């Protein structure tokens, strides 16, 4: 081969590998190279008819390239100045910078941090980021796939042809990167990978994409990153003060929402609202109802709507079902303007096995465990993250931090924590692998959760975010500080309280006396953790019926039972959570294909329940006795906890500074007249709430809004009062 041969410097094996799209290092062959005969440009452009090289500065011709093999062009040029390629696509001429004329974009330092498990390096290095390189606009693509033989980025810009844009491997981190000039936001793309043995894999969506196609499409989309990361936030005051609004001593009442079905548009094929519409409709509603926070079931992109978001693949991308990422940022900003916090359900426990997702990402079990006893969740037919791997742990923590940092979210409710903590969770004896000490505890998950909670406390510029665990076992120290050996969550769902009290309420009042302990047992462990009392979507799905449907009795009794239960819940220690539809006594259980039955509000009973929840939220926020000592023993005292025969409960709530309330619940349909209760202090007490009030749909029985104690001792108190206890009702009294 002569020195003037356009193939000079190319070995036959390299030529074969390039045209067959299996070369592991395309930058070693393509682009500008200096040879003894002068500068040479090589370009891989399948389906091109002719290629020439022109000066980037003035368009002057620098040389013509010869086609060595179909799609592979090479030739000498007169100058090694910055250049562009003039490509004749059989009659359509394109002028563009050569992807392979640009050097590496990612620095060694952040790549080193990525390999070491730094979540901020994930945010810095991976995904698709519009930028300028050497004055040329384009997009830097980067993906972690250490075991792939070759990775190409494919998309609208190259006709989804993996031969066009093979990427550069940065060996120290197993990251493939490529700067593609003249590509911009809005472009669809995926990655084409060859496994270690050269086997082509299904096209993969970008695990770190900030934007995606709307399902059933599965492509990633180059996001307007600056419109998110430089969003003009107006919530500085909220962010700086929110730490004081989300503590154990704060009133927290959460409205749980499935965003897609909250209010469907029947006239437009039952479509869900987008973020702009949700901001316009949902925020004023939630605020008017007195809730302090809205919690969304997972909004990270997920292929299957029937998973309700709990099988996500786009851990960094708000679902395209609701609009663009910057629209979600605008929703959060408007929520904060209205004084509402935003909590997201977040799923680090498992991921679905869709071929375009994380499973066998680079031809190996990269994100999941290789052993199905560790890497497969048989209950959900999903894959379990390998949290013992630095990069996987960093990937997930980066996702959590991204929602907090990029979108100013106020908290993460971490899903399925119990399944993460135990290696034998829902497994037969021979279907799990012990930890290194022979135990059932998942040490890698424990370390992950501790690190997550530590990192959430130190997100630059956005202090005060919280984490909430959905943890259904008695694992100790879920909300204890990491420094004290705990997991470090701020709050934990009290699943035991929920199960026990719902079981009690489902009983016919005749039999409730035999289940009295179900209503009192929660106080035995109420201060072992910082709890949220959850009446979530989980209790109104899969044939369980609605909250109203669980209540026994005729129509009147069902509503009365639900109102009494809400009164008990809102005055019981623990933060509050209620799923959409529950606030007005939805009749049917949750159906993600339909909205809550808002038309029921035309019925006075349903409207009455809604008004009660509104008033309970207001009472809760206005009365420090109901929240200030939620997580401290001094805030609660049983006055009557043992009257199982009458199914009556009475307790005292106090803020420790002189303000106190007395709550009395009658859980039978029998009015109790002259029922004597020992009162913490003598004098007048105002009846500030009665769930049997006529405005709520009740019988309007009560104490006329005011009671006076007398000197007759009762229940260990020197003062007492003879009360009228309405049927199936909760009353709240405040010392006047």
From Swiss-Prot:
One of its GO terms (molecular function) is 1,4-alpha-glucan branching enzyme activity. GO terms for biological process: glycogen biosynthetic process. The keyword Kinase does not apply. The keyword Transmembrane does not apply. GO terms for cellular component: cytosol. It catalyses: Transfers a segment of a (1->4)-alpha-D-glucan chain to a primary hydroxy group in a similar glucan chain. The active site is at residues 415, 470. It is an enzyme of class 2 (transferase). Its EC number is 2.4.1.18. Pathway: Glycan biosynthesis; glycogen biosynthesis. Keywords: Carbohydrate metabolism, Glycogen biosynthesis, Glycogen metabolism, Glycosyltransferase, Transferase. SUPFAM superfamilies: (Trans)glycosidases (SSF51445), E set domains (SSF81296), Glycosyl hydrolase domain (SSF51011). InterPro entries: A-amylase/branching_C, Branching_enzy, GlgB, GlgB_N, GlgB_N_E_set_prok, Glyco_hydro_13_cat_dom, Glyco_hydro_13_N, Glyco_hydro_b. Catalyzes the formation of the alpha-1,6-glucosidic linkages in glycogen by scission of a 1,4-alpha-linked oligosaccharide from growing alpha-1,4-glucan chains and the subsequent attachment of the oligosaccharide to the alpha-1,6 position. HAMAP family: GlgB (MF_00685). PANTHER family: 1,4-ALPHA-GLUCAN-BRANCHING ENZYME. Belongs to the glycosyl hydrolase 13 family. GlgB subfamily. Monomer. This is 1,4-alpha-glucan branching enzyme GlgB. It comes from Paraburkholderia xenovorans (strain LB400). The lineage of its organism: Bacteria, Pseudomonadati, Pseudomonadota, Betaproteobacteria, Burkholderiales.
